């Protein structure tokens, strides 16, 4: 490949369902490689599997890529010099390429029925040979006779005439030299009996027509590579470079799936992972970046990306590391941004009334400023912010008895309630001064009042700073909750 050629890479998914995290990582590696080298990133939709490909999946796929922050220079919605970018709209291109291969003798019409193919493979197994189809009588059939049968409407496929000797070898940027014995590769189908192309044929033709310089894809495609190389050579194409990215596995070293908690972009979005955090984490996963840092902007990741540094071993997905990165990105968001994220969640979960949230957005901004250091997922927000809204709380019985069972607390909580109620200003400083003042009068550490007061006002034993929290909960709610605790203490039979 000429060194002066502009880098052109493609991400070419089949739209058959949600976008798996392994596919997103492959897309990211293509995008990073293109951006690093000032190249072109192409999105190509490989939708020739008409039974499984759906328009809904195409749209979902594009949404997922855009959500995580990927843009494409050529492809659906943006066009480009090699349009169209959906394989079902490029069928004539594949048929022309097939005719060229037929005319050159590199391919042939195959009329074998499914029953013939089954018998061929059974016989090969019985004779101790690999069940590899090599064309039978059709491989060397007179081209004129084959064409006559085609014109008569006889069902057929078009197969590649695989060399029976030698090896097909390529240099994988990630794995090094990879080779296949040609004798182990059967005469593979190029065009199905329906006239639609197979994956290998369409991919090779498209890669050449779109001038792809580097094919960066999952390692489940390694066995496809010799077939595509054969097609390229038979058509006189310049070969792209190949790099096969290992799979993403769960901690149990099995392919990451829903049983591990999340597997698709949508899963992670639904579980409160920010797009920039998922981008950052997946770009680092098995990519060979120096371990001294973990948080990078996309431009920094592209600048540091080295395809040859990508590990040849499967990448093990570490949810805790992703959550740690996600927490960093949550902390980097402004309280205003977090409030915009939080409002619909709080309303949908029934934590707060939509009208109240809209009327008092500045308060929600302050709540998010208080809570953001404690969040790992955005979906933590409704639980974390719940005690700022509503009136009375549901208290855990065991913890209630632990917090209010001590004589000092029972004796002094009523006085604390009276002093808090009498405060002229409901501010964190005023609340703190009140609590610490009473504790000092009683010659006790402030913690003897702070812990039960936290539980009374939030229903939690752990929260953000108590006094700031009480200020934001508000005087009315705090006093109502403390009064509720006092009433329960006076009436032990009252249910929690």
Swiss-Prot record:
Keywords from the UniProt entry: Aminoacyl-tRNA synthetase, ATP-binding, Cytoplasm, Ligase, Nucleotide-binding, Protein biosynthesis
EC assignment: 6.1.1.17
Record's keyword annotation contains Transport: no
Reactions catalysed according to its record: tRNA(Glu) + L-glutamate + ATP = L-glutamyl-tRNA(Glu) + AMP + diphosphate
GO CC list: cytosol
SUPFAM superfamilies: An anticodon-binding domain of class I aminoacyl-tRNA synthetases, Nucleotidylyl transferase
Main localization of the protein described in the UniProt heading: cytoplasm
Binding residues annotated for ATP, in chain numbering: 258
Record motif 'KMSKS' region, residues: 255-259
Single Gene Ontology BP annotation: glutamyl-tRNA aminoacylation
Stretches that traverse the bilayer: none
GO molecular function: ATP binding; glutamate-tRNA ligase activity; tRNA binding; zinc ion binding
Location within or outside the cell: Cytoplasm
Pfam family, one: tRNA-synt_1c
Residue positions of motif 'HIGH' region: 13-23
Family in the record: Belongs to the class-I aminoacyl-tRNA synthetase family. Glutamate--tRNA ligase type 1 subfamily.
HAMAP family: Glu_tRNA_synth_type1
Chain's role: Catalyzes the attachment of glutamate to tRNA(Glu) in a two-step reaction: glutamate is first activated by ATP to form Glu-AMP and then transferred to the acceptor end of tRNA(Glu).
Subunit field text: Monomer.
PANTHER family: GLUTAMATE--TRNA LIGASE (PTHR43311), GLUTAMATE--TRNA LIGASE, MITOCHONDRIAL-RELATED (PTHR43311:SF2)
Name of the protein in question: Glutamate--tRNA ligase 2
Organism listed in the record: Rubrobacter xylanophilus (strain DSM 9941 / JCM 11954 / NBRC 16129 / PRD-1)
Gene: gltX2
